[in-house]
Amino acid sequence: MTLLDETASAQFGDDVAPTEEWAAEVRRLARQRGATLLAHNYQLPAIQDVADHVGDSLALSRIAAEAPEDTIVFCGVHFMAETAKILSPDKTVLIPDARAGCSLADSITADQLREWKAEYPGAVVVSYVNTTAAVKAETDICCTSSNAVDVVASIPADREVLFCPDQFLGAHVRRVTGRTNMQIWAGECHVHAGINGDELADQARAHPDAELFVHPECGCATSALYLAGEGAFPADRVKILSTGGMLDAARESRASQVLVATEVGMLHQLRRAAPEIDFQAVNDRASCRYMKMITPAALLRCLTYGTDEVDVDHETARLARRSVQRMIEIGQPGGGE
């Protein structure tokens, strides 16, 4: 811990309560710093509520690029703040705690991707946006969970595809496209991978009238489709959706109850979008400890001291930006990750 960290910790403590006074001070400091506050859907409810914008990582990064403010405070994990910096190279991008990593993004490095590419010369590399800037720089086309199928389908059928890093999203894309020349990296989000098929089946049986919203990063996504295919659960009530897709579906749903298979922070936005629906987590322990490192105290420290700043070197950012722009040219990324 640096002297600055020690000073900030002594001033704010690590157990700052998200009171109305705290929220007012956060907004005052943001105005003073000329900053816009962005919060990912998986953040603590108090962080979501105080933010100027809440959403998935790519949508927030695009908002950051269009925002009039010169400083962006990204309440999310590190690769998300990197993506904001890639799309807003002239802006100051801050993350309240630079230690907030991501098990999925960390499951492949740029060196590992280069070695993989060498095994399949001529292959097209498709990387999920949940990757580091260095991996994006080695990527041909990025994708989100909502447009991954369209991105892969846009690639000529005779070209090999290397899909990374999420094995469950990759399996979903391969299943939908029917593509046989598609290699999939064996990475995973530890939170989504932990939402298993047995839990999903038990919840579905216990709530036979509910709809199922399942994120494609989940280890249980295949189980959800199996339940529908076997008639154990009505197919029209099983939806494989990105976080943005979940919000759209919630606003249109006529169900009285929805079972949600993703990180539990998403429930806050779903309940705000459709307060008349009873949203329940398939696994109420599916909480990302990295996301929850962005605490009320960390946000106060960030706004007070201007820490932690995120930087991406010019060449890495240029190459990474190219892969993101190619994705956008293929089609709107829609509901994001």
UniProtKB/Swiss-Prot annotation:
Its EC number is 2.5.1.72. It comes from the Bacteria. The keyword Transferase applies. GO terms for biological process: 'de novo' NAD biosynthetic process from L-aspartate. Gene3D superfamilies: NadA-like. One of its GO terms (cellular component) is cytosol. Keywords: 4Fe-4S, Cytoplasm, Iron, Iron-sulfur, Metal-binding, Pyridine nucleotide biosynthesis, Transferase. The keyword Metal-binding applies. Pfam families: NadA. It catalyses: iminosuccinate + dihydroxyacetone phosphate = quinolinate + phosphate + 2 H2O + H(+). PANTHER family: QUINOLINATE SYNTHASE, CHLOROPLASTIC (PTHR30573:SF0), QUINOLINATE SYNTHETASE A (PTHR30573). Belongs to the quinolinate synthase family. Type 2 subfamily. This is Quinolinate synthase. It comes from Mycobacterium sp. (strain KMS).
